[in-house]
Amino acid sequence: MAGSSLRQVAVFGATGSIGASALDVIARHPERLRASVLSAGSKVEDLLALCAAHQPAHALIADAALYPALRDGLRALGLATQAHAGAEALDALAGSDACDTVVAAIVGAAGLPSTLAAARAGKRLLLANKESLVLAGELLTRTATAAGAEIIPIDSEHSAIFQCLRSCDAGRGVRRVILTASGGPFRGRDRAGLAAVTPAQAVAHPKWSMGPKISVDSATLMNKGLEVIEAHHLFGLPGEQIDVLVHPQSLVHSLVEFVDGSTLAQLGLPDMRTTLAVGLAWPERVESGVGGLDLLSQGRLDFEAPDTAAFPCLRLAWDALRAGGTAPAILNAANEVAVSAFLQGQVGFLAIPALVEHALTTLPRHNADTLDTLLFADAQARQITERALAHHALHA
């Protein structure tokens, strides 16, 4: 976009780890990128600090009760930034001319409405909120196509596939894609060795700096399962053409195998600023702040099959993808409730897949025709999982 006007970027989930990485890249390129909208859930002081640093036109706090604190804080800082609060205002900003690019980094199903609003408005959508695709992948991709919106994935694995496919024939001739997984902090442990895992251990990821929920998903391999479903929607591939390999070094982010026998892979240091720079500047390349990969110093690259017996969440995600309809929404919602309970010390680590499987096997699958249908399935899954927690059922 050399020679064009500033790209106006909305960073939803600005106080999280992905938001911080996005703002780091944006700040490196003031001549081409501007953080025009910043949002946060409830961390109003952190949001005010970001507003002081980046001076956006708009700032939003999702918790409406904190609106006065945001408004008064902006005034005290002498900023012209306009304060907003609540989900409806977030959706309105996503679809407004305040931005042409949206970094969708709100964790969980809460990020879906604003993501859909951005897609409906034809924005460039840098998608870090995997739940949007898992919960409503068909709806989101259909909406984006109809409005001319551009979805660029920010997950390192999907960004790798995106880059490999854009370098050749736009996806034709693909035999399979291979997502890589670090294996998380508990790689190599059996189920007995996972029973006593603590939340503090689960959020200590060996390679990536991530929020607590995503870190636990990585530890259970649910993160990789959700990425399998994402890849299905992003690249139009059936589950049979999507494989997973554990790669503990986290340097090869994904591979694409073509029908002619050739394979393309994307490599790089594990830093989200790389994929955000790809999304913000595509099809150009800009400095991200991440150094190059020195293969001589890195040494060996190892690959192994995932252990779905010890980590059944990956298998459950494939099951949900095959079932289709509302099954992925049920999977995602039950997982959110189970992970939250684990982080609060209510259940053990092995209860997470047990609770998810309980929801998948108990609730009926319906066609995912509308957002209302998907949100109803989401609510049902949360309810049945919370009921299981309340009755102390399935605690592992």
Swiss-Prot record:
1-deoxy-D-xylulose 5-phosphate binds at K130, S156, E157, S182, H205, S218, N223, K224, E227. Its EC number is 1.1.1.267. The keyword Metal-binding applies. InterPro entries: DXP_reductoisomerase (IPR003821), DXP_reductoisomerase_C (IPR013644), DXP_reductoisomerase_N (IPR013512), DXPR_C (IPR026877), DXPR_C_sf (IPR036169), NAD(P)-bd_dom_sf (IPR036291). It catalyses: 2-C-methyl-D-erythritol 4-phosphate + NADP(+) = 1-deoxy-D-xylulose 5-phosphate + NADPH + H(+). GO terms for molecular function: 1-deoxy-D-xylulose-5-phosphate reductoisomerase activity; manganese ion binding; NADPH binding. Pfam families: DXP_redisom_C, DXP_reductoisom, DXPR_C. Mn(2+) binds at D155, E157, E227. Belongs to the DXR family. Catalyzes the NADPH-dependent rearrangement and reduction of 1-deoxy-D-xylulose-5-phosphate (DXP) to 2-C-methyl-D-erythritol 4-phosphate (MEP). This is 1-deoxy-D-xylulose 5-phosphate reductoisomerase.
